[in-house]
């Protein structure tokens, strides 16, 4: 694994300070070179910081990640305010996913998708075949919502290993996907990436917020309006907690 760029504390999480181009190039370098050990990649936003502030186990997990990129615009703003001399750009998981799938230099990379529902995964694979014809999808798996047994985890690892996957994209929701990414990186010589809603966005089962809302930090209002029951706690509790965490841990 190439040396990771330095990290800087924003709230309760240590983030990799890079531009989008630097982040995707670092991932591409990983994927083009054989690995002897696994690598964990996280795309973290304000909600990840809020959760890490409340859960020390999750905080330790995130801060042990190999790469932790700034997935949310408010996190980028905080990084620029706290560390103005560093390179801070939004490294949005769905955008990074599309960049990697569509990069002709990565046509030999083998992709495995873990998470979401069977319907979404089928649509996702079909969409990738149409939009990114050079991308090699070697497998996908929709695990049950309950906690898997040890036997199920061993079977999962075996399927991934036998598929020859280079990268495993994990979309199990926060924080579950972050735990799974690090478990996979410890078990297999692959790159495991926690990309959240990227599955739904790529499969066109959930619409993304307009670009102007993403850039202005208002994406959360769009998502909350569309899914108030599911996302109310995430934003109405998480946003104030994020602000408190940033203030508490400022250098």
Go through the PLM ranges and name each one:
Residues 1-91:
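N-terminal nucleotide/polyanion-binding subdomain common to many enzyme families
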Residues 36-38, 109, 188-191:
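A short helix->loop->beta-strand "cap" motif at the edges of active sites that frequently abuts
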Residues 74-77, 81, 209-251:
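A transmembrane-helix-recognition feature enriched in membrane-embedded lipid enzymes
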Residues 76, 80-159, 163:
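Conserved beta-alpha
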């Amino acid at each position: 694994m190439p040396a990771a760029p330095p990290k800087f504390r924003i709230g309760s999480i240590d983030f990799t300070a890079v531009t989008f181009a630097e982040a995707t190039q670092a991932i591409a370098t990983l994927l083009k070179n054989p690995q002897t050990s696994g690598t964990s990649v996280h795309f973290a936003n304000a909600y990840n910081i809020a959760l890490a502030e409340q859960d020390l186990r999750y905080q330790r997990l995130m801060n042990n990640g190999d790469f932790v990129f700034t997935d949310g615009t408010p996190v980028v703003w905080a990084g620029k305010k706290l560390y103005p001399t560093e390179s801070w750009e939004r490294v949005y998981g769905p955008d990074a996913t599309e960049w990697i799938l569509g990069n002709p230099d990565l046509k030999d990379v083998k992709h495995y998708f873990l998470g979401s529902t069977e319907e979404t995964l089928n649509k996702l694979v079909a969409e990738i075949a149409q939009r990114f014809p050079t991308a090699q999808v070697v497998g996908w798996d929709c695990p049950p919502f309950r906690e898997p047994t040890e036997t199920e985890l061993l079977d999962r690892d075996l399927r991934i290993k036998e598929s020859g996957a280079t990268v495993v994209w994990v979309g199990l929701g926060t924080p579950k996907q972050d735990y799974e990414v690090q478990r996979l990186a410890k078990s297999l010589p692959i790159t495991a990436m926690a990309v959240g809603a990227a599955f739904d966005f790529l499969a066109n089962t959930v619409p993304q917020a307009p670009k102007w809302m993403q850039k202005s930090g208002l994406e959360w209002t769009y998502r909350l309006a569309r899914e108030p029951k599911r996302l109310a706690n995430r934003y109405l509790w998480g946003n104030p907690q994020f602000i408190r965490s940033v203030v508490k841990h400022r250098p």
